[in-house]
Amino acid sequence: MVYCENQFGLPDGKTAAALVRHSELYSIVGIIDSSLAGKDAGEELGEEKSGIPIFADLNDALESLSYTPDCYIYGKAPLETFIPIKERLLILEAMMKGMDIISGL
């Protein structure tokens, strides 16, 4: 699961976009970006339908999937030099649900 709130398909969401396009290490099962919820990640990148859904939030994703993904990937490159408090709380929520956290920051 890749978190990319309000940035998927934009320059600050390049990590998430790259993972949707190609990943040998991770199986991407969804993107979290409430501004694009209900859409297909591949189509939002101007490509073919990928079958990777975009969810409003983690709870929406977990309700739609029949399992909890192994990883929660922070797929944004924020302008700030730190992860904002609100997003840190979302990371903690994913940890409490048993997900490993992956971040390139």
Across the structure, where does each feature detected by a protein language model lie?
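N-terminal phosphate-binding or glycine-rich loops at protein starts, especially the Walker A/P-loop
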Residues: M1-L25
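Short glycine-rich anion-binding loops that position phosphate/pyrophosphate groups of nucleotides
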Residues: Q7-F8, A37, K76-L79
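Generic hydrophobic/aromatic pocket-lining and core-packing "Φ" positions
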Residues: A16, E87-I91
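N-terminal beta-loop-helix "entrance" segment that forms/cooperates
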Residues: Y26, S34-P53
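Short internal beta-strands
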Residues: S27-S35, I102-L105
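Glycine-rich, highly charged phosphate/nucleotide-binding loops
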Residues: G46-L65, I83-E87
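N-terminal glycine-rich "phosphate-gripper" loop used for MgATP/nucleotide binding
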Residues: D70-R88, L105
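Beta-strand-loop-alpha-helix segment that lines the small-molecule cofactor/substrate pocket
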Residues: L90-L105
